[in-house]
UniProtKB/Swiss-Prot annotation:
Signal sequence range: none
Entry keyword tRNA-binding: no
Location relative to the cell: Secreted, Extracellular space, Extracellular matrix
PANTHER family, alphabetized: PROTEIN WNT-4, WNT RELATED
Name of the molecule in the record: Protein Wnt-4
UniProt keyword annotations, A-Z: Developmental protein, Disulfide bond, Extracellular matrix, Glycoprotein, Lipoprotein, Secreted, Wnt signaling pathway
């Protein structure tokens, strides 16, 4: 009798953390570009001529992000003024980052609650 050999190949996504790290790295090194017409085709070139041309692997953008610190209804940005922040956090919810250098006021609140504790 004959025997069969089966070979199965499939592609799998790398771990989510790895994908996130690669995207963050690309985001941090992204280049602002503009369209230029070369003959009958449009090409993307760095807006700042001192930057090297991008590759197919690079992340590029045409428009800068709005300033999320300031209120701008035209762009749907509510701003960060008046929001609650976390004084001890260094992340995006932290006061240093969220308040955009405007400074911030701190309030210390003590909450007294009744509980059904039994000793």
């Amino acid at each position: 009798s004959g025997s069969c050999e089966v070979k199965t190949c499939w592609k799998a996504m790398p771990p989510f953390r790895k994908v996130g790290n690669v995207l963050k790295e690309k985001f941090d090194g992204a280049t602002e570009v503009e369209q230029r017409k070369t003959g009958s085709t449009k090409v993307l070139v760095p807006k700042n001529s001192q930057f090297k041309p991008h590759t197919d692997e690079d992340l590029v953008y045409l428009d800068s992000s709005p300033d999320f610190c300031d209120h701008d209804l035209k762009n749907g940005v509510l701003g960060t003024s008046g929001r609650h922040c976390n004084k001890t956090s260094k992340a995006i919810d932290g006061c240093e980052l969220m308040c955009c250098g405007r400074g911030f006021h701190t309030d210390e609140v003590e909450v007294v609650e009744r509980c059904s504790c039994k000793f």
